[in-house]
Amino acid sequence: MLKFIQNNREITALIAILALFGLLGVIDRQYFSLQTVTLIFSSAQILILLAMGATLVMLTRNIDVSVGSITGLCAVIMGMSLNAGFSLPVSCLFTLLLGMCAGLFNGVLVTWLKIPAIVATLGTLGLYRGFMLLLTDGKWIEGLPDELKSLSAPLWLNISPIGWLLMILVLAMAWILAKTAFGRGFYATGDNLQGARQLGVRTNSIRIIAFSVNGVMAALAGIVFASQIGFIPNQTGNGLEMKAIAACVLGGISLLGGTGSVIGAILGAFFLTQINSGLVLLKLPAWWNDFIAGFVLLAVLVFDGRLRCAIEKNIRQQKYARFLKNDKNNQVT
């Protein structure tokens, strides 16, 4: 049973989602509807994008705590570009390039300058947040065009254009990680860095790509934020990094690297967003969100650690039992 949970974290995350649906459905019968699912999916899009980027970084046994600041900075650049008269496609391109450059800078700090990821990204967290406030002078960006807001308007099956694009990105990343040698390079890099190098995996390139894609995903999250909210506060992106990491860990991405899948991370992001919807249903204050996200992260880490210890203990017991059995057979003969 323990080994099943460890090897099938996506299934356990899905079971948790269904169980929470059942619990909230008992409280409010109207919760059981397709509209509820699409609303949660719409609310989860920002966190899903951040979880996708964090998946690549965590698979390589690194961590990036600057994604919230990158999201805020990219949202600001998006809003300023549009208000300056640039078209929507050009503004999106500027934003994505900025996100990629921010992620690339993180990757260079970690890979080439050998700075621990947590230290490097803590530094860039403040750097990007400060740059964002310098650009806006601490003010909000308002008056965004309706063209941007239309990206998050419901389309077919009550899902927005961004929602459909997101599903395509999820499927593409899942296929790349599971079915290609390039994708397996992320797992190899996080599982055994030296061993991966001996097998010919370009580990430095893999890690830089992971951070760069993470930056692009944060930029996409900034675009989604601007389109959904319609304005950009000066605190955009605050605290999102913790929720992204919590979603990944909840979905089975190991902090030790080399384990997990993007599907699990997506399910973790959906579950955390579902908890937020439950708080609304229960009429609890919004500041419970961060508390619950932190509690879930801590609980999953404790559970994951205990689960690993239990599995390792069980493996040792089986190994010793086999040796003892062989010794008894030798004594009999």
Swiss-Prot record:
NCBIfam families: PRK15432.1 (NF011961). Keywords: Cell inner membrane, Cell membrane, Membrane, Transmembrane, Transmembrane helix, Transport. GO terms for molecular function: transmembrane transporter activity. Belongs to the binding-protein-dependent transport system permease family. AraH/RbsC subfamily. The keyword Zinc-finger does not apply. CDD domains: TM_PBP1_transp_AraH_like. It is a multi-pass membrane protein. The chain crosses the membrane at residues 14-34, 39-59, 70-90, 93-113, 115-135, 157-177, 213-233, 252-272, 284-304. The complex is composed of two ATP-binding proteins (LsrA), two transmembrane proteins (LsrC and LsrD) and a solute-binding protein (LsrB). It comes from Photorhabdus temperata. This is Autoinducer 2 import system permease protein LsrC. It is found in: Cell inner membrane. GO terms for cellular component: plasma membrane. Part of the ABC transporter complex LsrABCD involved in autoinducer 2 (AI-2) import. Probably responsible for the translocation of the substrate across the membrane. InterPro entries: ABC_transp_permease. The gene is lsrC.
